[in-house]
């Protein structure tokens, strides 16, 4: 997820979208008592500054098992930032998959969702 979001931010003229599955948006192994970190805030600001609102398609998701259990708060902050910045549902999609983990088997099981979103005509 991180490398896909970076590719879109860095080369928006090349990549028209990004599928960010189980994005490690905490950028570290977080302290669960910490509500927001400087690294998480910097990642959100980077996204906000480098991807034109509704200028590409951006898909993000996560589960709630293994590493993904740490992403819920950070992902909620990203979702808030995206919607407050004006992203619409044609260009930004977030999905939550309860009971799924940060692993290839779970990503494979839901790969159709980001692909259909990214490849759909506007």
Mark where each language-model region is.
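Non-catalytic cap/lid and distal C-terminal segments of serine-dependent acyl enzymes
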Residues: 1-122
């Amino acid at each position: 997820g991180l490398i896909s979001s970076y590719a879109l931010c860095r080369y928006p003229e090349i990549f028209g979208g990004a599928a960010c599955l189980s994005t490690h948006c905490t950028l570290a192994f977080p302290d669960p008592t910490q509500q927001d970190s400087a690294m998480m805030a910097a990642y959100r600001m980077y996204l906000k500054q480098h991807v034109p609102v509704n200028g590409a398609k951006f898909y993000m998701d996560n589960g709630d098992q293994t590493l993904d259990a740490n992403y819920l708060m950070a992902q909620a902050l990203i979702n808030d930032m995206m919607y407050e910045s004006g992203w619409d549902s044609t260009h930004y999609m977030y999905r939550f998959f309860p009971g799924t983990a940060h692993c290839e088997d779970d990503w494979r099981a839901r790969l159709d969702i980001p692909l259909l979103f990214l490849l759909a005509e506007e």
